[in-house]
UniProtKB/Swiss-Prot annotation:
<keyword id="KW-0694">RNA-binding</keyword>
<feature type="domain" description="TNase-like 4">
    <location>
        <begin position="587"/>
        <end position="714"/>
    </location>
</feature>
<dbReference type="GO" id="GO:0005635">
    <property type="term" value="C:nuclear envelope"/>
</dbReference>
<dbReference type="GO" id="GO:0005829">
    <property type="term" value="C:cytosol"/>
</dbReference>
<dbReference type="GO" id="GO:0048471">
    <property type="term" value="C:perinuclear region of cytoplasm"/>
</dbReference>
<feature type="region of interest" description="Disordered">
    <location>
        <begin position="227"/>
        <end position="250"/>
    </location>
</feature>
<keyword id="KW-0007">Acetylation</keyword>
<dbReference type="GO" id="GO:0009651">
    <property type="term" value="P:response to salt stress"/>
</dbReference>
<dbReference type="InterPro" id="IPR035437">
    <property type="entry name" value="SNase_OB-fold_sf"/>
</dbReference>
<feature type="region of interest" description="Disordered">
    <location>
        <begin position="971"/>
        <end position="991"/>
    </location>
</feature>
<keyword id="KW-0378">Hydrolase</keyword>
<dbReference type="InterPro" id="IPR002999">
    <property type="entry name" value="Tudor"/>
</dbReference>
<dbReference type="GO" id="GO:0031332">
    <property type="term" value="C:RNAi effector complex"/>
</dbReference>
<feature type="domain" description="TNase-like 2">
    <location>
        <begin position="186"/>
        <end position="364"/>
    </location>
</feature>
<dbReference type="Pfam" id="PF00567">
    <property type="entry name" value="TUDOR"/>
</dbReference>
<dbReference type="GO" id="GO:0006402">
    <property type="term" value="P:mRNA catabolic process"/>
</dbReference>
<dbReference type="InterPro" id="IPR016685">
    <property type="entry name" value="Silence_cplx_Nase-comp_TudorSN"/>
</dbReference>
Length: 991
């Protein structure tokens, strides 16, 4: 110790009491990192009874002496000074310590817990400055029989503790399992004798004085390393004007320090970062203090694992939780598993928060990469349309108009995983209990109103499903779904949310994920620390635990019921015909709608015969895929009957194996729903006498026509249309549209838009409201073939909806890379650079394209590469697109051989008679008259309407032939039975 430190009063706090005359005092403040410096002070001129060393016994009254001093001053602020130092005993420092105005040495002597050591002749300077008062107080204590001077017979012997063998060092005689069995879950009183590191303490268990080492359950503090036996003790040098302890000193080893030194290795290993700070944190709170220990378990090395609780004023605190919350220990799963679930969750949550806040030992923590991302403020209400599996639903958003395909949102239930349904195309069978899980939700949710809280999205990895290289990333959206109108049986099965949750963010109702788990139809996903998870994760864990305890569903030892289903949709048509008699015998057959294949065609499951069939309405047809209103018809049917219980009557089966008949849902003929909405029409070729409730279907169709709904929006009642002049009557009823031509191709083909269609104005308004941003960053947006985007038309720089027709095979590397795009609302097609395309909002891209491909009926027009092809194309362009007129298009037939729309000239083609509103003859007849087209070849099996139309057109062709104009200038031309393919015209057209 520096000489200047003697005889100077310092301030500190009592950290530990090692005996009845010795304290460890730490500085109140310090200027360096880490724990404050400390001093070990023995009271000058006093000698308290000595505590037992290992294998020894106490001196009489040693424990009472130490306890008196411990209870008097532990954790309290004191003032002290060093009176003298004895080099012969490792430089031990002796001094005077005051608690407030009380001299602690005087209090100890006065109560008889220490005797006064008188100085020898050679040590006259090694004496307390209060020696006279101490001697007087000692004499009084002797006279009164206080403390060690007790005059009670046998008091000295009774004060000696009967110490059991120590459980530290040589633990051969210590029965850790027996101690645990006797005290499991019970709080045990103890006094902490030593802190080995932040999460390991050595304790006297009361009242037996069993000396044990306890590892704090669920946590692990940084290691203190291994130390040599020549340990150093801190020395104090005054460097503050107020006299606080602020430097280091050497002092004698305490009993606890000797215990640590005895187990130390001769090889020194440095401590981990924050180890010293964690140790001091624990010392400051529990060393030499009363604690309560709850034993949780014993590890394979016979070490005790327990929770340690201490008092902080009126509050009882958990040492392990405090260490973790302050970033001085980490959560340890293996020992936390011994604890109660609630305590374990608190530790885990505290560590996660410290990692997020980068506290202490987590300052440089970098969370592992995660493929999940939180979703904020995307809650909605809607109706369940489809149960995909036990953990995935499709919900129609109430905020989106009824019937819109954009209304449907796929929601995966957060933080749970149900058995997979498999994939019939890849010959993957459903996992055990997969069908049961889906059916369980189907019966409870289909058609029900639910509340959805979106919580996070996750990037789909290869483990989640097949991916193709270069394909755009796919994301799955997860959320919690609540059923407000749950049945009482279901409500009773799940844990009711606390009142605070109901008043806060949790909707009133049953959490569907919780219901799935309680029935044993799923497991809770064990997320990594920083992965997003359900906001109701704890409730899900509790539900899973209940299913495990009850051995329900996938947790039971029973195998799931085997089910063999005959799928006639993938079988030969002959097999379907074999089933026809058995289905016709039953008047109304209960069935479940498995899929909506189109507006009028479905896949049904018939439980009675465990069979799946393809089913279509008799005499009712919806627009085909790619045609206007086809998607809306599908959407309406999904909302109305998807996965619902229905009844069917089978009338016949077609050549493809599809059964034809009628369907009822809740006693309503489903076909009437489509007809009333203007999304289907009756087929006159199918005898009305063969259709059940045909009169209802006719009434529904008539109602839609009168209101001009959907496909009937341009319908004109009783209108007669001629290919030649207005006096020739077409008796067969045909659909008539009012249109404007937007693009002319060649070979008599062109694109039209419906005139006055409100959808056109709606989409134009949506596009006008968009804020077109700068070109996307290279690599952030990689559109592929078939994607709908925004593209800038080269002629007027307007932004329009477009479909990618061709795209670079590799990821985009330059803003000049070329994409061929098809403008789905106009029919134009051109090549544009990457810089001229943008991503499009799904709400704008969802509506079908407004441009409809058409071809002039009953005539053959030369292609652009043929003779008179350019003249024909120019004429058609002039009289249609160039005139700006409005036309009536009479649909003679629909050609679906073009398949889906993939670009210009593809998709369903309307074969039409086109006539301007103010003209007497059709464009078809006019082109024959100009000699730039010829009639189709007559066919013997053509229907009467077609023959009549050809008869009316023939006079116009004869007029051109006789005048030898156009293609007839050299006389008759050879008949060509084949239509020539149209060539594409450079982009242009109407805007």
């Amino acid at each position: 110790m520096a000489t200047g430190a003697e005889n100077q009063w310092l301030k500190g706090r009592v950290k530990a009491v090692t005996s009845g005359d010795c304290l460890v005092i730490t500085a109140l403040s310090h200027n360096r990192a880490g724990p404050p410096p400390e001093k070990t002070i023995t009271f000058s001129s006093l000698m308290a009874p000595k505590m037992a060393r290992r294998g020894g016994i106490d001196e009489p009254f040693a424990w009472e002496s130490k306890e008196f001093l411990r209870k008097l001053c532990i954790g309290k602020e004191v003032a002290f000074k060093v009176d003298y130092k004895v080099e012969a005993i490792a430089g031990r420092e002796f001094g005077s310590v005051f608690l407030g105005n009380e001299n602690l040495a005087k209090l100890v002597v006065k109560t008889g817990w220490a005797k006064v050591r008188e100085p020898g002749q050679q040590n006259q300077d090694k004496v307390s400055p209060y020696i006279k008062e101490l001697l007087q107080l000692e004499e009084l204590a002797k006279q009164e029989g206080y403390g060690r001077w007790s005059k009670v017979p046998g008091a000295a012997e009774a004060s000696i503790r009967n110490l059991p063998p120590s459980a530290i060092g040589d633990s051969a005689g210590f029965d850790a399992m027996g101690l645990l069995a006797a005290n499991k879950g019970k709080p045990m009183e103890g006094i902490v004798e030593q802190v080995r590191d932040g999460s390991t303490i050595r304790v006297y268990l009361l009242p037996e004085f069993q000396f044990v080492q306890v590892f704090v359950a669920g946590v692990q503090a940084p290691s203190m390393g291994r130390r040599t036996t020549n340990g150093s003790v801190v020395e104090t040098v005054p460097d503050e004007p107020n006299g606080d302890v602020s430097a280091e000193s050497r002092g004698p080893l305490t009993t606890a320090q000797r215990l640590a030194a005895s187990a130390a290795s001769s090889v020194e290993v440095s401590s981990d970062p924050f180890a010293t700070e964690a140790k001091y944190f624990t010392e400051h709170r529990v060393l030499s203090r009363d604690v309560r220990i709850v034993l949780e378990g014993v590890d394979k090395f016979n070490n005790l694992i327990g929770s340690v609780h201490y008092s902080d004023g009126e509050t009882v605190k958990d040492l392990g939780l405090e260490l973790v919350e302050n970033g001085l220990a980490k959560f340890v799963e293996w020992s936390a598993n011994m604890m109660e679930e609630e305590a374990k969750k608190k530790l885990k949550a505290a560590e996660l928060q410290c990692k997020k806040d980068k506290v202490k030992m987590w300052a440089n923590y970098v969370p592992p990469a995660t493929n999940s991302k939180a979703i904020h403020d995307q809650n909605f209400t809607g109706k369940v349309v489809e149960v995909v599996s036990g953990d995935c639903l499709i919900v129609a958003d109430d905020a989106v108009p009824f019937g819109s395909p954009a209304a449907e949102r796929r929601v995966c239930l957060s933080s749970i995983r149900s058995p997979k349904m498999g994939n019939p195309r890849r010959e993957e069978k459903p996992a055990p209990y997969a069908r049961e899980a889906r059916e369980f939700l189907r019966q409870r949710l289909i058609g029900k109103q639910v509340i959805v809280q979106m919580e996070y999205s996750r990037k789909v990895t290869q483990g989640d499903g097949p991916t193709t290289s270069g394909a755009a990333d796919r994301f799955m959206d997860f959320g919690s779904v609540f059923l407000p109108s749950a049945a009482k049986a279901d409500s009773d099965e799940v844990t009711a949310p606390p009142a605070a949750a109901i008043a806060g963010s949790q909707p009133v109702g049953v959490n569907i994920a919780e219901l799935v788990l309680v029935r044993g139809f799923g497991n809770v996903v064990r997320h990594r620390d920083f992965e997003e998870r359900s906001n109701h994760y704890d409730a899900l864990l509790a539900a899973e635990a209940r299913a495990l305890a009850g051995k329900k569903g996938i947790h039971s030892a029973k195998e799931s019921p085997a089910m063999h289903i005959t799928d006639l949709t993938v079988s030969a048509a002959k097999k379907a015909k074999d089933f026809l008699p058995s289905l016709q015998r039953i008047r109304r057959i209960p069935a479940v709608v498995e899929y909506v294949l189109s507006g009028h065609r479905f896949k049904l499951y018939i439980p009675k015969i465990t069979c799946s069939i393809a089913f279509s309405f008799s005499g009712v047809r919806c627009p085909g895929r790619g045609e206007p209103y086809s998607e809306e018809a599908i959407s309406v049917m999904r909302r109305r009957i998807m996965q619902r219980d229905v009844e069917i009557e089978v009338e016949t089966v077609d050549r493809t194996g599809t059964f034809l008949g009628s369907m009822w849902e809740s006693r309503t003929n489903v076909a009437t729903v489509l007809l009333e909405a203007g999304l289907a029409k009756m087929q006159t070729s199918f005898g009305a006498d063969r259709i059940a409730e045909a009169h209802l279907l006719e009434q529904a169709e008539r109602s839609a026509k009168n209101q001009k709904l959907k496909i009937w929006e341009n319908y004109v009642e009783g209108e007669e249309v001629s290919n030649g002049n207005t006096n020739t009557v077409e008796t067969r009823q045909k659909e008539t549209l009012k249109v404007v031509v937007t693009e002319v191709l060649g070979g008599g083909r062109f694109y039209v838009q419906s005139a006055g269609d409100q959808k056109i104005a709606s989409i134009q308004n949506q596009l006008a409201s968009l804020s077109i941003k700068d070109a996307p960053i290279i690599g952030s947006f990689n559109p592929k073939r078939g994607d709908i985007v925004l593209a800038q038309f080269s002629l007027d720089n307007s932004w329009n909806r477009a479909m990618i027709v061709t795209a670079p095979r590799a990821a985009v590397q330059s803003p000049d890379e070329k994409f061929e795009v098809f403008y789905i609302d106009y029919g134009n097609q051109e090549t544009v650079p990457y810089s001229a395309i943008r991503p499009i909002d799904p709400s704008v891209s969802a509506a079908p394209g407004l441009a409809q491909l058409c071809r002039l009926a009953y005539i053959k027009v030369p292609s652009l590469e043929d003779d008179f092809g350019p003249e024909a194309g120019e004429y058609l362009h002039t009289v249609t697109l160039g005139s700006g007129k409005e036309f009536k298009a009479v649909i003679e037939e629909r050609d679906t051989s073009g398949g889906k729309v993939k670009g210009q000239g593809t998709g369903t083609e309307f074969v039409v008679t086109l006539i301007a509103v103010d003209d007497e003859i059709s464009v078809n007849a006019a082109m024959l008259q100009e000699g730039i087209a010829r009639m189709e070849k007559r066919q013997k099996w053509g229907h009467k309407g077609k023959q009549a139309a050809l008869d009316a057109l023939e006079k116009f062709q004869e007029e051109a032939r006789k005048s030898r104009i156009g293609i007839w200038q050299y006389g008759d031309i050879e008949s060509d039975d084949e239509d020539t393919g149209p060539a594409r015209k450079p982009a242009g057209g109407r805007r």
